[in-house]
């Protein structure tokens, strides 16, 4: 279903909501999915992704980190912002794991 929908011509007026789209995908397939999603955004569409994969999270324009735990321990907004901003929030489990990835990417770019 996902590949069929994403292969349609983008109108620039569509809201895409994806729940864990990387589940079961190979790393290369995740990379291809990210290319498609970023292309949809570049064409003016809005893409909302519910995801735990840090390779996807680190490419987001904006993150809403909900937690801090799952189930009864969750449901609160822990952090919002760019990946860099979320990585600076001590209460964010996502930020804690995201920070080293962002640091490594910065070091590789230098």
From Swiss-Prot:
Subunit structure: Forms a heterotetramer with UvrB during the search for lesions.
Chain's gene name: uvrA
GO MF, any single term: nuclease activity
Family, per entry: Belongs to the ABC transporter superfamily. UvrA family.
One GO CC term, this protein: cytoplasm
Biological processes annotated in GO: DNA repair; SOS response
Role noted for this protein: The UvrABC repair system catalyzes the recognition and processing of DNA lesions. UvrA is an ATPase and a DNA-binding protein. A damage recognition complex composed of 2 UvrA and 2 UvrB subunits scans DNA for abnormalities. When the presence of a lesion has been verified by UvrB, the UvrA molecules dissociate.
Keywords: ATP-binding, Cytoplasm, DNA damage, DNA excision, DNA repair, DNA-binding, Excision nuclease, Nucleotide-binding, Repeat, SOS response
The organism of origin for this protein: Paracoccus denitrificans
Stated name of the protein: UvrABC system protein A
Alphabetized SUPFAM superfamilies for the sequence: P-loop containing nucleoside triphosphate hydrolases
Compartment list: Cytoplasm
Predominant localisation class: cytoplasm
InterPro entries in UniProt: P-loop_NTPase
